[in-house]
C-alpha cells in the first residue's frame, strides 16, 4: 500500500513538473503572439504611409498636367495673337492695294494726257521706245518671279500635304493608343476580378480595406484616362482647325495677291516703269512673308510635337508610379496574409497546449482524490496515523465521469500471528475526456474568434493609423472551471483496530 502511495506521489510530482514546463511554453507562446501583433500593427502603419504616398503622387500628377495645360493655353494665346497680327497686316495691305489702284487710275489719266502730248513731242519718241524695251525686260523678270511664286506655291502645297499626312499619322497613333488603353483596361479588369475572387476568402476586415483601395485605384485610373483622352482630342481638333484656317488663308492670300499683282504689272508695264519696279518689290516682300509664315508653321509644328511628347512622358511616369505603388500594396498584402497564417498556427498550438494543460489538471485532481480516498479508506489522517475502528466490512459503489471501478481489501486476524494481505484483483482504471476551452463573451464579427468579456484586445488598444477605424480580433482563451465528482467503487475487507 505504501509503495502504491509513493508511486502515486512520484507520478504527481512528475505531472507537476510537466505542468510547470507547459506553463513556460505557454508564456513563450504568449510572447510570440505579442510580437506578431506588434508586427501586424507596424505593417498596418506602413500601409497607411503607402496610401499617403499614393495620394501625394496623384496630386503631383494632377498638378503637372494642369501646368502643362496652362503652358499650352498660353502658347495657343500667343499664336492666336500672331494670327490676329497677320490678319491686321492683311487688312493694311488691302488698304494699300486700294490706294495703289486709285493711284493707278490717276496714272492712267496722266498717261492719256501724255499720249496727247506725244504727237507734239516726237523728239522723245526714241526715249519712249527705249523705255518700252526696258519695261518688256522687266516684264520678263516679272514672269520669272511669277514662276518662282508658282514653284513656292507648289512647295507650300507639298508641305500642306505633308502636314495632313502627319495629322493622319497622329490620328492613327491616337487610335492605336486608345486600343492599347482599352486592352490594358481589360487586363486590369481581369486582374481586379481575380484579385476580388481571392480576396473573398480572406478576413472580413482585410476584404473591406482591399475593396476600398481597389475602388480608389480604379476610379483614379479611369478618371485620368478620360481626362487625358478628352484633352488630347480637344487639343488635336483645335490645332487642326487652326492649321486648316491658317493654311487656307495663306494659300488664298498668296494666290490672290500674286495673280492680282501680275495682272497689274502686265497692264502697267507699258505705262509706268517705276510702278512696275515698286510692284516687283512688293511681290518680293510678299514672297519673304510667305517664307516667314512657312517658318512660323514649322515652329508651331515643332512646339506641338514637343507638347505631345511632354504629355506622353507625364502619362508614362504616372503609370510607372501607379504600378510601383500597386506592387508595394500587393507585397504588403502577401506579408499580412502570411502573418495571419502564422497567427492562426500559433493560436492552434496555444489551444492544443491549453488542452494538454487542462488534461494534466484533471489528471492531477483525479490522483489527489484517489490519494484522499485511499487515506479515508485506510482510516489515516493527514500525518499518516492509523485510526482504530471496529472490525467490520464496508462496501461502496459509485460512478462518475471517469468511469473508474475497482475492488480490493485488507484483513488481519487478531487471534493469530499470521497477517493476511489481500490485494486488489484489478487496478482501478479511469477514463477522462478533456473539456475544451471555449471563448467567453460576445460573438466576433470575423466568425473565427470570440472576444473575451464582449471586447476584443484590439478594441482595448489604439488602432494603428487612427483614420482606418479597423479592429482585429485576437483569440484570447479563458480557462473554464472544471467541476467533477469522484466516486470509487470497490469492496474492502475486514478492518482491524490497532
UniProtKB/Swiss-Prot annotation:
InterPro entries: IF_rod_dom. It is found in: Cytoplasm; Cytoplasm, Cell cortex. Residues 232-371 are annotated as: Coil 2. GO terms for molecular function: structural constituent of cytoskeleton. Coiled coil: none annotated. It comes from the Eukaryota. Residues 393-409 have a biased composition (Gly residues). Residues 214-231 are annotated as: Linker 2. Residues 22-378 form the IF rod domain. Residues 18-58 are annotated as: Coil 1A. Keywords: Coiled coil, Cytoplasm, Intermediate filament, Stress response. Pfam families: Filament. Residues 70-213 are annotated as: Coil 1B. SMART domains: Filament (SM01391). Intermediate filament (IF) protein that forms both short filaments and extensive cytoskeletal networks which most likely are homomeric. Some of the cytotardin arrays display cage-like perinuclear structures, while others are located in the periphery close to the cell membrane. The entire tardigrade body is ensheathed by a grid of belt-like filaments formed by the cytotardin protein, which retain their integrity even in contracted specimens. This is Cytotardin.
Amino acid at each position: 500500500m505504501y509503495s502504491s502511495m509513493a508511486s502515486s506521489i512520484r507520478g504527481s510530482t512528475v505531472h507537476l513538473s510537466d505542468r510547470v514546463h507547459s506553463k513556460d511554453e505557454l508564456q513563450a507562446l504568449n510572447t510570440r503572439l505579442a510580437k506578431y501583433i506588434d508586427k501586424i500593427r507596424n505593417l498596418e502603419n506602413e500601409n497607411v504611409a503607402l496610401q499617403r504616398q499614393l495620394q501625394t503622387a496623384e496630386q503631383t500628377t494632377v498638378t503637372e498636367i494642369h501646368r502643362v495645360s496652362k503652358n499650352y493655353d498660353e502658347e495657343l494665346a500667343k499664336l492666336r495673337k500672331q494670327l490676329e497680327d497677320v490678319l491686321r497686316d492683311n487688312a493694311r495691305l488691302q488698304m494699300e492695294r486700294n490706294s495703289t489702284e486709285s493711284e493707278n487710275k490717276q496714272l492712267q489719266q496722266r498717261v492719256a494726257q501724255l499720249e496727247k502730248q506725244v504727237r507734239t513731242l516726237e523728239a522723245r519718241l526714241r526715249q519712249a521706245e527705249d523705255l518700252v524695251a526696258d519695261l518688256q525686260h522687266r516684264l520678263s523678270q516679272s514672269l520669272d518671279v511669277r514662276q518662282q511664286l508658282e514653284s513656292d506655291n507648289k512647295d507650300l502645297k507639298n508641305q500642306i500635304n505633308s502636314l495632313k499626312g502627319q495629322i493622319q499619322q497622329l490620328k492613327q497613333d491616337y487610335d492605336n493608343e486608345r486600343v492599347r488603353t482599352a486592352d490594358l483596361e481589360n487586363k486590369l479588369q481581369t486582374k481586379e476580378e481575380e484579385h476580388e475572387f481571392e480576396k473573398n476568402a480572406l478576413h472580413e476586415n482585410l476584404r473591406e480595406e482591399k475593396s476600398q483601395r481597389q475602388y480608389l485605384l480604379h476610379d483614379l485610373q479611369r478618371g485620368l484616362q478620360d481626362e487625358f483622352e478628352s484633352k488630347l482630342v480637344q487639343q488635336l481638333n483645335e490645332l487642326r482647325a487652326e492649321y486648316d484656317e491658317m493654311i487656307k488663308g495663306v494659300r488664298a492670300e498668296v494666290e490672290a495677291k500674286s495673280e492680282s499683282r501680275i495682272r497689274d504689272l502686265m497692264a502697267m508695264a507699258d505705262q509706268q516703269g517705276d510702278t512696275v519696279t515698286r510692284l516687283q518689290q512688293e511681290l518680293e516682300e510678299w514672297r519673304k512673308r510667305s517664307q516667314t509664315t512657312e517658318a512660323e508653321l514649322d515652329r508651331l509644328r515643332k512646339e506641338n510635337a514637343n507638347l505631345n511628347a511632354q504629355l506622353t512622358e507625364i502619362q508614362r511616369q504616372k503609370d510607372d508610379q501607379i504600378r510601383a505603388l500597386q506592387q508595394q500594396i500587393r507585397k504588403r498584402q502577401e506579408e499580412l496574409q502570411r502573418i495571419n497564417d502564422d497567427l492562426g498556427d500559433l493560436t492552434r498550438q496555444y489551444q492544443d497546449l491549453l488542452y494538454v494543460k487542462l488534461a494534466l489538471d484533471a489528471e492531477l485532481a483525479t490522483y489527489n482524490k484517489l490519494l484522499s480516498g485511499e487515506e479515508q479508506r485506510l482510516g489515516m489522517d493527514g500525518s499518516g496515523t492509523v485510526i482504530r475502528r471496529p472490525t467490520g466490512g464496508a462496501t461502496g459503489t459509485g460512478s462518475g465521469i471517469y468511469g473508474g471501478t475497482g475492488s480490493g481489501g485488507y484483513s488481519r486476524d487478531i487471534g493469530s500471528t499470521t497477517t493476511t494481505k489481500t490485494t486488489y484483483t484489478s487496478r482501478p482504471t479511469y477514463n477522462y475526456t478533456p473539456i475544451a476551452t471555449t471563448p467567453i463573451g460576445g460573438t466576433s464579427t470575423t466568425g473565427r474568434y470570440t472576444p473575451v468579456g464582449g471586447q476584443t484586445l484590439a478594441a482595448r488598444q489604439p488602432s494603428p493609423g487612427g483614420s482606418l477605424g479597423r479592429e482585429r480580433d485576437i483569440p484570447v482563451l479563458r480557462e473554464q472551471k472544471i467541476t467533477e465528482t469522484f466516486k470509487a467503487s470497490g469492496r474492502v475487507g475486514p478492518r482491524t483496530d490497532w
